[in-house]
């Protein structure tokens, strides 16, 4: 569960390293974001020479959460860290590579480019 002020690692090569969640999109009083949800973030740390700079406000999609997620078949999935991928307004990733595994729920939410770039889909 990602909420306001949550910090996330960046799972792509856009240049950002850490994000701070500012807002969870999808409703006026929505509190939590889960895997596949879009959030508005501020870049807290970035690598020099990257596409994204520190202090920039970006949209990102959550790809890994430490909270357990229940699937339709009754199984649960849980990751070691909270991570997100920075996206543009047309839901395409800013970076050209994705690091680490991503959840299968992204395919249901139509983030096909992220799923195809990921080295492993769990």
Swiss-Prot record:
Regions that span the bilayer: none
Among its keywords, does the record have Ribonucleoprotein? Answer: yes
What InterPro entries does the record tag this protein with?
Ribosomal_uL14, Ribosomal_uL14_bac-type, Ribosomal_uL14_CS, Ribosomal_uL14_sf
- Cysteine pairings via disulfide bonds: none
- GO BP annotations, alphabetical order: translation
Keyword RNA-binding included in the entry's annotation = yes
- Signal sequence span is none
Q: Name one GO molecular function term.
A: structural constituent of ribosome
Using the record for this protein, list the coiled-coil segments as residue ranges, or answer none: none
Annotated function: Binds to 23S rRNA. Forms part of two intersubunit bridges in the 70S ribosome.
The UniProt entry's sequence similarity note says: Belongs to the universal ribosomal protein uL14 family.
Full protein name: Large ribosomal subunit protein uL14
Gene of origin? rplN
